[in-house]
Regions:
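Walker A/P-loop NTP-binding motif
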Residues: 34-35, 47-63, 80-82
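Conserved nucleic-acid-binding Ia/Ib motif block in the N-terminal RecA-like helicase ATPase lobe
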Residues: 65, 71-120
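Hydrophobic positions in the central parallel beta-sheet of the AAA+
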Residues: 41, 65-66, 118-120, 142-144
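ATP-hydrolysis module of ASCE/P-loop NTPase motor domains
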Residues: 114-129, 141
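Single conserved hydrophobic/aromatic residue that forms the stacking wall/gate
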Residues: 149-161
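Conserved pre-motif I regulatory segment
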Residues: 2-42
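SF2 helicase catalytic motif II
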Residues: 130-152
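Pre-Walker A (Motif I) flank of P-loop NTPase domains
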Residues: 35-41, 62-63, 115-116
Length: 161
């Protein structure tokens, strides 16, 4: 994996996102992603989790696949990325809210190399056409953003006596 000096990471943070410094352990997490290491990130809401995969996606060859559970969250993330770039193709999502024409445009942007972040709902990854599409492209890494999923203990029905 390509090595990035701290000053270059800070320069790219400013260039792409307008921030002059990282929060908490973002820089260490980003370095791990850039080095191809499996990385688990647990941060509070507003802690900057998304940047931990967005900045590496901008710096690496290929497209980062982000698995996110909510269509609204995907749209917000894509809209936010598009505010940082003059190219609206920089980030896209593929989910059930898109018609065939929109899906074709997303795929064309990804295949052309414009797209650096592609968001999927988990269930979209079970569709054969999406799996086939992923085999055609260079994926830089996968990120699973489960920030809004609530995991609780399973409940069992009371036994009937």
């Amino acid at each position: 994996m390509k090595q990035f000096e701290s000053s270059l990471l800070h320069d790219k943070l400013k260039e792409y996102f307008g921030f002059s410094s990282f929060k908490g352990n973002q820089e260490a997490v980003i370095r791990n992603v850039l080095e191809g290491k499996d990385t688990f990130v647990l941060m509070p809401t507003g802690g900057g989790k998304s940047l931990c995969y967005q900045l590496p996606a901008m710096l690496m060859e290929g497209v980062a696949i982000v698995i996110s559970p909510l269509i609204a969250l995907m749209k917000n993330q894509v809209d936010a990325m598009r505010t940082f770039s003059a190219d609206s193709g920089i980030a896209h999502f593929l989910n059930s809210s898109l018609n065939k024409t929109a899906v074709a445009q997303v795929r064309a942007d990804v295949l052309s190399g414009k797209t650096k972040l592609l968001y999927f709902a988990p269930e979209s990854l079970t569709k054969e056409d999406n799996v086939a599409f992923l085999h055609k492209i260079k994926v830089s890494f996968y990120a699973i953003d489960l920030s809004l999923i609530h995991i609780s203990e399973p409940t069992r029905p009371e036994p009937i006596s």
